[in-house]
Amino acid sequence: ELAHDALYFITDPSEPAWCQTAVHHSDEVVLVADATTSPDVTEIEAKLLSGHRNLRVPTTLVMVHPAGTKSPSDTAAWLDVRHVNRHVHIRAGHAGDMARLSRILSGRAIGLVLAGGGARGLTHLGIMAALDEAGVVFDYVGGTSAGAIMGSFAAMDVAGDKMKVVSRDSFVDGPIGSITGDYNWVPYLSLLKGGRALKASERAIATNATSNMDMADCWKNYFVIASNFSTHQEQILTRGDLAVNVVASSSIPGVMPPTLMDGELLFDGGSFNNFPVDRMRAMGAAKIIGVDLLPDLDRRYELPKIPTSGQALRDRFRPRGKRR
């Protein structure tokens, strides 16, 4: 330990005594699993960790997928039966995945955080394409609102140049039309029905991965922020249906209906945390690339009161330099 920054103990199921010793002296346990096998806890795994529950040793599950796998699946089944602090998906023989695993295990992970910003969110696509072209890599992804939508492409490991094509095909030119076109003619809950947004998200995800994809099935660890109006606080979503969670994070109050989750109402995450750099830092990222789309400017209006609709409309017809 005096001569090296890190020591790795390689255990062998045929030597249970050594396994116990290795775990007892470890600062972190890394479980490596063949993702094509049963998710059930093996006998050696149960024996290995059962005697050290009170040590609270951080545990990482590394799931190895066959080369060429389009998307992980059924990750939730693995996570539900064992206590791990994080999981990492890698493809056999994939140099980029191995480099990502190395950064995560050595505490050098790079996080990408995409802020909300309405229509400005399309800017994220250009930025991610530029990062990809420049060879800039990242290991964790997090986003709010529009950043949650665009961040899902990065989390699914969609190539930078393909993101724009898939986004336009799903959210603008898709078979259901524009996501802002499903007006609610009786806007009791919201201006838009919200159905198109969900279908468009499902279409984008199915094109790049699989239908009904869980957030835990993303190649890169991913979180989105929603605003829980039932508990009056932000809510971090890392598990559950990816399309549903993305819509929950981007449902602007009054414009789209809330997402009902476990009996609670979730709206656009921008109400509580529009630029969740703090959550990315808590996730363990050593370096963070943050993209904030909203200008940090204070704007004051020299008006005695809010104008009426007619006054505001007339003001729009004035020359730009004379508008109030």
Language model: regions and residue ranges:
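Cationic-aromatic interfacial patches
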Residues: I10
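Patatin-like phospholipase
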Residues: E1-A6, S14-T144, S152-R324
